[in-house]
Design a protein with these regions (language model features):
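Conserved double-stranded beta-helix
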Residues: 1-68
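Short edge-strand/loop segments of extracellular domains
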Residues: 16, 72-79, 140-146
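Short, surface-exposed loop/helix-turn segments at secondary-structure junctions
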Residues: 27-39, 85-103, 152-156
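Non-heme Fe(II)/2-oxoglutarate
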Residues: 84-90, 97, 111-116, 120-174
Length: 174
């Protein structure tokens, strides 16, 4: 985005503790989330309006259960396969219940630390049982091919990531 360009996206400020909800994380842009601030389109359908997102910690998050940004490793690949088998259209109804290969990881960090995550990585905010408020800023970036690739990225997660595609191709060739 050019410097000085107007920002047309909504901003998100969470003012209450985030729990585990249905016992797991989520993908942004689904009805289960229920608000446009996290990517739900105005017409109520699911959306993939960004390529990756960044979470920037503004204060120290020293250990688990401090409101940590929490991710399920490999979930982007698990959901890629799930959407290949069942279609991404199931997202219009709900967040699919899929068994994750690994437990969630509470990401710890210091002020200024940045976590970059793929749009299809299952994530949430962990409960915060510490006496400190967890402050973070979340950015969603839209790659230049995001709109062109559209929903195809659900079943080909690296479709708009040329550099990553090349690395994966080379690794599989060896």
């Amino acid at each position: 985005m050019p410097v000085g360009a107007p920002i047309n996206e909504s901003h998100q400020i969470l003012t209450k503790a985030i729990g585990w909800g249905r016992g797991g994380g989520h993908l942004d842009g689904l009805k289960a989330v229920g608000d446009r601030l996290r990517g739900l389109k105005k017409d109520g359908t699911y959306n993939r309006g960004f390529t990756a997102f960044a979470v920037v910690y503004l204060n120290k998050v020293p250990k688990p259960y401090c409101g940590n940004f929490t991710v399920w490793p490999e979930s982007h690949r698990v959901f890629e396969q799930h959407f290949i088998e069942h279609g991404h259209e199931i997202l219009d109804d709900h967040m699919p219940h899929v068994v994750m290969p690994e437990p969630p990881i509470h990401i710890t960090g210091d002020p200024g630390d940045v976590v970059l995550a793929h749009h299809q990585l299952v994530h949430t905010g962990a409960p915060n049982i510490s006496s400190n408020i967890r402050y973070a800023v979340i950015f969603r970036s839209k790659g230049v091919l995001c709109e062109e690739v559209g929903f195809d990225a659900f079943t080909d997660i690296w479709k708009e990531w040329d550099g990553i595609r090349e690395v994966i191709h080379k690794a599989r060739s060896n």
